[in-house]
């Protein structure tokens, strides 16, 4: 699937820390640039990115970088993934931490339920040819934990929370 992305739109960005917009964006972290200025990692506060963050939590994405999100002119966001997912051990590293602790929406809960239920049917059979039984069990457990919590997860503190480089 080839898609032309809109280079004028950035779903994730590094900006001056004192320039973080009050709405429409989520603050993730702050750091220093090469000149010692304080900068902030931010991402847009959009339903498309929320869905991607839920997906990343379910599949245990270990490498969601800013440039792994392609912004299309119609507002759609494509996630670029390359297989650092579905590990049985906790590996979630992402630039999409802006919703940590926020309640999941009914649509997000429904999506998690569909994945969880699908693991007992066609989705489970399909994944059985691609993942180990342990990886599928871990996927099911992540769905259950996320659904029970009803909130976006936050960093575990056990490992780096963001991939490096960020983009």
At which residue positions do the language-model features occur?
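Phosphate/dinucleotide-binding and metal-coordinating scaffold of catalytic cores
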Residues: 1-167
């Amino acid at each position: 699937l080839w898609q032309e992305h809109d280079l004028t739109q950035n779903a994730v960005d590094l900006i001056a820390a004192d320039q973080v917009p009050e709405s429409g964006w989520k603050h993730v972290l702050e750091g220093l640039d090469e000149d010692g200025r304080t900068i902030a990692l931010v991402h847009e506060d959009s339903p498309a990115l929320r869905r991607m963050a839920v997906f990343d939590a379910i599949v245990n994405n270990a490498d969601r970088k800013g440039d792994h999100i392609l912004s299309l002119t119609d507002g759609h966001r494509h996630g670029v993934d390359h297989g650092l997912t579905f590990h049985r051990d906790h590996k979630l590293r992402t630039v999409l931490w802006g919703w940590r602790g926020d309640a999941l929406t009914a649509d997000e809960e429904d999506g998690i339920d569909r994945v969880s239920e699908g693991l007992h049917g066609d989705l489970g059979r399909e994944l059985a040819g691609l993942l180990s039984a342990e990886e599928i069990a871990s996927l099911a457990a992540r769905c259950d934990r996320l659904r029970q919590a009803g909130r976006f997860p936050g960093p575990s503190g056990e490992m780096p929370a963001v991939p490096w480089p960020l983009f």
